[in-house]
Curated annotation (Swiss-Prot):
Identification of the protein by name: 2-C-methyl-D-erythritol 2,4-cyclodiphosphate synthase
Underlying gene: ispF
Cofactor comment: Binds 1 divalent metal cation per subunit.
Lineage of source species: Bacteria, Pseudomonadati, Pseudomonadota, Gammaproteobacteria, Enterobacterales
Any GO MF annotation of the entry: metal ion binding
Record-listed a divalent metal cation binding positions: 8, 10, 42
Protein's pathway: Isoprenoid biosynthesis; isopentenyl diphosphate biosynthesis via DXP pathway; isopentenyl diphosphate from 1-deoxy-D-xylulose 5-phosphate: step 4/6
Organism listed in the record: Photorhabdus laumondii subsp. laumondii (strain DSM 15139 / CIP 105565 / TT01) (Photorhabdus luminescens subsp. laumondii)
Cofactor(s) the record lists: a divalent metal cation
Keywords on record: Isoprene biosynthesis, Lyase, Metal-binding
Gene3D superfamilies: 2-C-methyl-D-erythritol 2,4-cyclodiphosphate synthase
Amino acid sequence: MRIGHGFDVHKFGGEGPIIIGGVRIPYEQGLLAHSDGDVALHAATDALLGAAALGDIGKLFPDTDPAFKGVDSRKLLREAYSRIREKGYRIGNLDITIIAQAPKMLPHIPQMRVNLAEDLQCHIDDINVKATTTEKLGFVGRKEGIACEAVALLVKE
Protein backbone atom coordinates (compact mmCIF):
# COMPACT_ATOMS: atom_id res chain seq x y z
CA MET A 1 0.00 0.00 0.00
CA ARG A 2 1.09 3.53 -0.73
CA ILE A 3 -0.37 6.82 0.46
CA GLY A 4 -0.22 10.20 -1.28
CA HIS A 5 -1.38 13.70 -0.41
CA GLY A 6 -2.42 16.45 -2.81
CA PHE A 7 -3.26 20.13 -2.46
CA ASP A 8 -4.44 22.76 -4.90
CA VAL A 9 -5.76 26.30 -4.77
CA HIS A 10 -7.13 28.66 -7.40
CA LYS A 11 -8.10 32.30 -7.20
CA PHE A 12 -11.48 33.55 -8.36
CA GLY A 13 -11.48 35.78 -11.43
CA GLY A 14 -13.29 36.29 -14.69
CA GLU A 15 -16.72 34.89 -15.38
CA GLY A 16 -18.22 31.66 -14.08
CA PRO A 17 -19.16 28.91 -13.97
CA ILE A 18 -16.51 26.95 -12.10
CA ILE A 19 -15.65 23.28 -12.56
CA ILE A 20 -15.07 21.19 -9.44
CA GLY A 21 -14.84 17.40 -9.49
CA GLY A 22 -15.68 17.51 -13.18
CA VAL A 23 -19.01 19.22 -12.43
CA ARG A 24 -19.94 22.64 -13.86
CA ILE A 25 -21.19 24.72 -10.94
CA PRO A 26 -22.96 28.03 -11.55
CA TYR A 27 -21.13 30.92 -9.89
CA GLU A 28 -20.64 34.58 -10.71
CA GLN A 29 -16.87 34.15 -11.01
CA GLY A 30 -14.61 31.57 -12.58
CA LEU A 31 -11.32 30.20 -11.28
CA LEU A 32 -8.09 31.52 -12.77
CA ALA A 33 -5.91 28.70 -14.08
CA HIS A 34 -3.94 27.45 -17.06
CA SER A 35 -6.26 24.43 -17.30
CA ASP A 36 -9.96 24.38 -16.34
CA GLY A 37 -9.05 25.19 -12.71
CA ASP A 38 -10.65 22.09 -11.17
CA VAL A 39 -9.07 22.18 -7.71
CA ALA A 40 -10.60 18.85 -6.65
CA LEU A 41 -9.23 16.92 -9.62
CA HIS A 42 -5.86 18.68 -9.37
CA ALA A 43 -5.51 17.76 -5.68
CA ALA A 44 -6.69 14.20 -6.40
CA THR A 45 -4.25 13.83 -9.30
CA ASP A 46 -1.38 15.07 -7.12
CA ALA A 47 -2.32 12.67 -4.32
CA LEU A 48 -2.38 9.72 -6.72
CA LEU A 49 0.88 10.71 -8.41
CA GLY A 50 2.52 11.20 -5.02
CA ALA A 51 1.45 7.76 -3.84
CA ALA A 52 3.00 6.21 -6.95
CA ALA A 53 6.17 8.34 -6.69
CA LEU A 54 5.45 9.85 -10.12
CA GLY A 55 6.02 13.47 -9.17
CA ASP A 56 3.15 15.91 -9.43
CA ILE A 57 0.65 17.39 -11.84
CA GLY A 58 2.97 20.28 -12.73
CA LYS A 59 5.73 17.89 -13.71
CA LEU A 60 3.49 15.73 -15.91
CA PHE A 61 1.34 18.52 -17.35
CA PRO A 62 3.34 21.78 -17.09
CA ASP A 63 1.49 25.09 -17.32
CA THR A 64 4.21 26.24 -19.71
CA ASP A 65 2.93 23.77 -22.31
CA PRO A 66 0.23 25.31 -24.53
CA ALA A 67 -1.22 21.82 -25.08
CA PHE A 68 -2.68 22.01 -21.58
CA LYS A 69 -4.24 25.48 -21.91
CA GLY A 70 -7.88 25.15 -20.83
CA VAL A 71 -7.62 21.35 -20.73
CA ASP A 72 -10.33 19.27 -19.05
CA SER A 73 -8.82 18.10 -15.76
CA ARG A 74 -10.65 14.78 -16.07
CA LYS A 75 -8.39 14.08 -19.04
CA LEU A 76 -5.31 14.81 -16.89
CA LEU A 77 -6.60 12.58 -14.09
CA ARG A 78 -7.23 9.69 -16.48
CA GLU A 79 -3.76 10.04 -18.03
CA ALA A 80 -2.09 10.15 -14.61
CA TYR A 81 -4.07 7.10 -13.48
CA SER A 82 -3.06 5.23 -16.62
CA ARG A 83 0.59 5.76 -15.66
CA ILE A 84 -0.15 4.59 -12.14
CA ARG A 85 -1.78 1.42 -13.48
CA GLU A 86 1.32 0.80 -15.63
CA LYS A 87 3.32 0.69 -12.38
CA GLY A 88 1.00 -2.06 -11.12
CA TYR A 89 -1.17 -0.06 -8.71
CA ARG A 90 -4.90 0.51 -8.45
CA ILE A 91 -6.96 2.83 -6.31
CA GLY A 92 -7.64 1.69 -2.75
CA ASN A 93 -9.55 4.81 -1.83
CA LEU A 94 -9.53 8.55 -2.40
CA ASP A 95 -10.67 11.16 0.12
CA ILE A 96 -11.12 14.77 -1.02
CA THR A 97 -11.86 17.87 1.05
CA ILE A 98 -13.00 20.97 -0.85
CA ILE A 99 -12.46 24.18 1.12
CA ALA A 100 -14.78 26.92 -0.13
CA GLN A 101 -16.89 29.65 1.42
CA ALA A 102 -18.97 29.78 -1.76
CA PRO A 103 -20.55 28.34 -3.79
CA LYS A 104 -22.15 25.53 -1.83
CA MET A 105 -20.74 22.16 -2.90
CA LEU A 106 -23.16 19.73 -1.22
CA PRO A 107 -25.66 19.48 -4.11
CA HIS A 108 -22.82 18.63 -6.53
CA ILE A 109 -20.91 16.05 -4.48
CA PRO A 110 -22.84 12.96 -5.70
CA GLN A 111 -21.96 13.72 -9.35
CA MET A 112 -18.34 14.46 -8.39
CA ARG A 113 -18.11 10.98 -6.86
CA VAL A 114 -19.62 9.42 -9.98
CA ASN A 115 -17.11 11.27 -12.21
CA LEU A 116 -14.13 10.25 -10.09
CA ALA A 117 -15.20 6.61 -9.83
CA GLU A 118 -15.65 6.51 -13.60
CA ASP A 119 -12.27 8.11 -14.33
CA LEU A 120 -10.45 5.92 -11.80
CA GLN A 121 -12.26 2.73 -12.83
CA CYS A 122 -13.26 1.96 -9.26
CA HIS A 123 -16.36 1.51 -7.13
CA ILE A 124 -18.07 4.70 -5.98
CA ASP A 125 -17.57 3.56 -2.37
CA ASP A 126 -13.82 3.99 -2.91
CA ILE A 127 -14.35 7.74 -3.44
CA ASN A 128 -15.27 10.25 -0.75
CA VAL A 129 -15.79 13.96 -1.37
CA LYS A 130 -16.67 16.43 1.33
CA ALA A 131 -16.72 20.22 1.63
CA THR A 132 -16.06 22.68 4.40
CA THR A 133 -15.66 26.41 4.87
CA THR A 134 -13.05 28.38 6.79
CA GLU A 135 -15.74 30.16 8.84
CA LYS A 136 -15.06 33.32 6.80
CA LEU A 137 -11.36 33.33 7.71
CA GLY A 138 -8.49 33.84 5.26
CA PHE A 139 -8.60 34.11 1.46
CA VAL A 140 -11.17 31.32 1.20
CA GLY A 141 -13.38 32.97 3.81
CA ARG A 142 -13.15 36.27 1.94
CA LYS A 143 -14.33 34.42 -1.18
CA GLU A 144 -11.08 35.10 -3.03
CA GLY A 145 -10.58 31.49 -4.08
CA ILE A 146 -11.08 27.79 -3.42
CA ALA A 147 -8.65 25.25 -1.97
CA CYS A 148 -8.72 21.48 -1.91
CA GLU A 149 -6.83 18.64 -0.22
CA ALA A 150 -6.84 14.97 -1.17
CA VAL A 151 -5.43 11.76 0.25
CA ALA A 152 -5.11 8.65 -1.91
CA LEU A 153 -4.36 5.05 -1.05
CA LEU A 154 -2.96 2.85 -3.80
CA VAL A 155 -2.71 -0.93 -3.56
CA LYS A 156 -0.43 -3.21 -5.54
CA GLU A 157 -2.30 -5.38 -8.06
